[in-house]
Amino acid sequence: MDTSMNFSRGLKMDLMQPYDFETFQDLRPFLEEYWVSSFLIVVVYLLLIVVGQTYMRTRKSFSLQRPLILWSFFLAIFSILGTLRMWKFMATVMFTVGLKQTVCFAIYTDDAVVRFWSFLFLLSKVVELGDTAFIILRKRPLIFVHWYHHSTVLLFTSFGYKNKVPSGGWFMTMNFGVHSVMYTYYTMKAAKLKHPNLLPMVITSLQILQMVLGTIFGILNYIWRQEKGCHTTTEHFFWSFMLYGTYFILFAHFFHRAYLRPKGKVASKSQ
């Protein structure tokens, strides 16, 4: 592990020089101490869903086109920047010292740049709960996979941030990548711009691929742990496997209903 840690420090100096804004005060101690607040946030989120749908039941839908464009555009830019910074770090580590270093050791927490973006990543999971408000206020179908995914991702991100789950680097990196495409699509759709017809299917396919890769990383984590070569726990493996497994089933089911079933259409996961 010392080798991987030393390498990550060297990598930061050679390839990941932080910008001034990325040297912001480290707020990890605060977030780690209050990570259980994510459960309260999720409870409030679920209650607001019930209240919001009840309130809108007898009212006309709101257009919210401009706010939705700005909302999606902001999250798209944020995700793209996070993708560029995180993929550069993870890919360099993987191709230099091997995949095991990125799966078994939380080396990403030792890098100032990644530390900054992981902090923002956690906060973004709270912000993204606002997606649901647009669905409710515009009276679009709110499907199970949407609110289940939003709420559990926040909980798991908080859990991983608190416990420095080794495979969390890939969880964050893949999520940034998928969201950079997804929110770009949502921006184009809200602005009524032309986009490839296959783009929604591509996004769902990327989401499914993310779950498959996440499950593979979890299995590798478990195998290498048996060799006493991974700094992980049974609890880490269990929750990672459970969440990736349920996400895979839900997104695969959505893909089948939306794109493979001959008749009938399903509303976009987060319109």
Swiss-Prot record:
Modifications the protein undergoes after translation, according to the UniProt entry: N-Glycosylated.
Q: Where in the cell is it found?
A: Endoplasmic reticulum membrane
Q: Organism's domain of life? A: Eukaryota
| Annotated metabolic or biological route of this protein | Lipid metabolism; polyunsaturated fatty acid biosynthesis
Induction text = Strongly up-regulated in brown adipose tissue in conditions of brown fat recruitment, such as cold stress, perinatal development and after diet-induced thermogenesis. A synergistic action of both catecholamines and glucocorticoids is required for the induction.
Annotated catalysed reactions:
a very-long-chain acyl-CoA + malonyl-CoA + H(+) = a very-long-chain 3-oxoacyl-CoA + CO2 + CoA; eicosanoyl-CoA + malonyl-CoA + H(+) = 3-oxodocosanoyl-CoA + CO2 + CoA; hexadecanoyl-CoA + malonyl-CoA + H(+) = 3-oxooctadecanoyl-CoA + CO2 + CoA; octadecanoyl-CoA + malonyl-CoA + H(+) = 3-oxoeicosanoyl-CoA + CO2 + CoA
**One biological process term in Gene Ontology:** fatty acid elongation, polyunsaturated fatty acid
Q: What class of enzyme is it?
A: transferase
- A molecular-function term among this protein's GO annotations: fatty acid elongase activity
Could you say which EC number(s) this protein's record lists?
2.3.1.199
Give glycosylation sites per the record: 6
- By its UniProt entry, which Pfam families does this protein fall under? ELO (PF01151)
Indicate the transmembrane segments per the record. 30-50, 67-87, 116-136, 141-161, 165-187, 199-219, 236-256
Q: Can you state the subunit structure given in the record?
A: Interacts with TECR.
Q: What's the name of the protein?
A: Very long chain fatty acid elongase 3
Q: What is the lineage of its organism?
A: Eukaryota, Metazoa, Chordata, Craniata, Vertebrata
